[in-house]
Amino acid sequence: MQQFPLYKQHDSMLCGITCLRMVCKHFGVSYSAEFLSSLCIEGREGISLLALSKGSTRIGLKNECGLVGITEIQNILPCILHWNQNHFVVLYKVKKGKTFYIADPAKGLVKYNLEEFKKHWVSTQSGGEEKGIAMFLEPTPAFYEKKMDEEPKEERSFKFLFGYIKQYLKYYNAIKFNGMDINLENSIVNYIESICK
């Protein structure tokens, strides 16, 4: 079996985007993390499952998300899992219902036995069954027919850098620039946003 494509996240906020990127590559289409980030609206805590769902739909992936049992996740692989209640990983293979193969954008390709897997993934019990959150993805013909054009590299890189910096601005009220206090929210952010439009 061919090894599952692995990309590493460059930041703790990009685990969901990186998982979506790995699934796209598995299905035969390559996208940059920057481009996928532009399709998925980030929140303060990173990318939500809803944002991943909307972004994947825009590139032609049919998706279903929900609380499911361990038996159900083995039927449609690969799938994106909500892991440790604060991270996303891709489950790409299950061997005999006992060994679970994970593409973790923070750790790499990892395998877990059933008990270890449940410890990381299970978030609740419903009807006597242990369940966790999963997103199932399936390519539609549109996914293969028309790969969405990515923006020119220079512009894409600038937008990605701005998006990356913007999420950390909440930690700073002001900066010193040539001896003057400049309020980031009012000056730099507004200028950069006007360039990115």
Where on the chain are the PLM-derived regions?
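Polar low-complexity intrinsically disordered regions
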Residues: 1, 86, 166-170, 191, ...
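Noncatalytic regulatory segments and standalone regulatory/sensor domains
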Residues: 17-19, 40-47, 53, 73-84, ...
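Transmembrane helix-loop-helix hairpins at lipid-water interfaces of multipass membrane proteins
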Residues: 173-197
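Cysteine-nucleophile protease catalytic domains, especially the papain-like/related folds used
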Residues: 1-68, 75-77, 82-88
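Aromatic-residue detector
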Residues: 31, 93, 190-193
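A broad detector of the eukaryotic-type serine/threonine protein kinase catalytic domain
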Residues: 2-3, 41, 142-144, 178, ...
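Generic alpha-helical segment signature
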Residues: 13, 29, 151-154, 190
